[in-house]
Amino acid sequence: MATYAIGDVQGCYPELQRLLEKLRFDPAQDRLWFCGDLVNRGGQSLDTLRLIHGLRESAIVTLGNHDLSLLAIALRKQDAQARVNPELREVLFADDAPVLFEWLRSQKLLHHDEALGWTMVHAGLAPIWTLRQAQRCAQEIERELSSPRYTRLLKNLFGNRPAAWSSRLQGIERMRASINTLTRMRFCDVNGRIDFEGKGAPGTQKPGMYPWFEVPGIRRREMRVVCGHWSALGRFAGLGVYGIDTGCVWGGKLTALRLDVEEPQYITVDAEPHRKRLAGEGD
């Protein structure tokens, strides 16, 4: 049985199909971990969601910021939903949208496999978090999203404050800080305060900011973390962190990382020729 983590798909359905073919993926034996941002910008978000939803127990998903945004948009009135981009509109008005949204709300913010020794998140971990703290923060959000109270969280999801997670935070502010960390973080300062504007490669950040995994004094965790979200970082391996957002939606590659082997193995497919490589990166 093989276990692969897959970077940000963002609706790049043809590339996902080609990648699964290249992996010779067998749903009866193999497992796929998706780092999040399943939807938006690639053109075929609905097909992507249907494919991954159909994998059932063969797929594990950690939600990304685009996935959470889609869930929040789904709570708007229909006239507001009709004003979003055509790709997301197709998802919102699909006959099976309620099933797909309920499934998305049941997914994770963090996944840890003790036997494999791997942890997966979409973006990153707060410098002060232990693994157990990170799991607790993720589980708080997961419980809320899968409960009848999910609308309260999704309606208060967005905002850059608090910019840093703290054990003193409570309620919605605590969950928003955790979500910002798990799904939006790239650069932060020594106190874990996130720079929400910095989206370039390491070395382009503002003074006093660091890639989240290079913060001085960071709690070094005896684990390996696989994450996406940061296409300007690209394929990265260092300090126990493996970045696999290789910018497929921008004309780069879609990347899988095999996890169940002593030396992690990268497998990639090129983006479809029509995808345009853009300078910089979106959220």
Predicted regions and their residues:
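Active-site neighborhood of divalent metal-dependent phosphoester bond hydrolases
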Residues: 46-49, 54-173
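Residue-level marker for buried hydrophobic side chains located in beta-strands
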Residues: 5, 34, 61-62, 119, ...
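Active-site-proximal beta-strand elements of phosphoester/diester hydrolases
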Residues: 2-10, 118-124, 243-244
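A general structural motif
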Residues: 27-30, 56-58, 120, 222
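N-terminal active-site segment of His-dependent metallophosphoesterases
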Residues: 1-55, 68
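Acidic, His/Gly-rich catalytic cores of divalent-metal-dependent hydrolytic chemistry
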Residues: 135-283
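Active-site environment of divalent metal-dependent phosphoester hydrolases
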Residues: 12-14, 40-43, 66-72, 128, ...
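Divalent metal-coordination and catalytic microenvironments
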Residues: 8, 37, 64-65, 104, ...
